[in-house]
Amino acid sequence: MSREEQPYIVATDGIVDALTKISSVFSAYLSANIHILNKYINYLRRVTSLKNERSIMIKIVKKLRFFNDTLLSTDLAQLQTTYEGEEPELALNIQTFASYLVKCLETIDLLNYFLLKPLQKELIAKTLNFDLVFPEDITDTVEDTYNHFVKFTQWSIESLSIDDPLLDIEVVQFSLRCAEEDQSYAEETDNIFLQEVLPVKDSQEYETLTLQWLDVLNGKLAILGERFEKVADDWYKKFGKNRS
């Protein structure tokens, strides 16, 4: 469906409320990452050979905290901005909010890569200490959570038939390019990014699906929080607060 054929989706009070809740769960996602990073940074103080890597993590925490503060202070009533007396069009007004979510996710993507791959290799190579290495099974949870937050953001944009390269998400575009080169199809893969996004028919459908996504993201975030808490507890048992 082309943008011209897409129904005029009004930014209703219900949609604003649903997206405000989405903003809150994104904030909680950022907070979960900030919390585990702060604990990790504290324990890495004992590894002097990783001073530079620790500095990078401190910078990332500052960035995530800034993103989080901005989300918390943003009033999504701006989604109901009107132009020339017309009812507020969601596809027009949501793009600034969506672009901010994309920015947050691209940063978390870099964090996940750095934290779970290069940093872990450096930690082992420089210290031979496996006590501070993230357990391998947490990687799947981190990636699954990230993928669902990305998929929601992709859906929130594409379901309104918004076609703007400035709103593209790198991991989604990479998956699409690989699928095209391999001539694979959505029904033949479990790659969530290849699952088709259908345009919504009206404001009520957008609100309903957003609330369904909210439940999904809250569920994924709860699992991630449990895994992070388990890792933090293991660190505490190994090092103890008096030696951190």
From Swiss-Prot:
SUPFAM superfamilies: RNA-binding protein She2p. GO terms for biological process: intracellular mRNA localization; mating type switching; mRNA transport. GO terms for molecular function: lipid binding; sequence-specific mRNA binding. Its main location: cytoplasm. One of its GO terms (cellular component) is cellular bud tip. It is found in: Cytoplasm; Nucleus. It holds the Pfam family She2p. The keyword Cytoplasm applies. Keywords: Cytoplasm, mRNA transport, Nucleus, RNA-binding, Transport. Belongs to the SHE2 family. Homodimer and homotetramer. RNA-binding protein that binds specific mRNAs including the ASH1 mRNA, coding for a repressor of the HO endonuclease. Part of the mRNA localization machinery that restricts accumulation of certain proteins to the bud and in the daughter cell. This is SWI5-dependent HO expression protein 2. It comes from Candida glabrata (strain ATCC 2001 / BCRC 20586 / JCM 3761 / NBRC 0622 / NRRL Y-65 / CBS 138). The lineage of its organism: Eukaryota, Fungi, Dikarya, Ascomycota, Saccharomycotina.
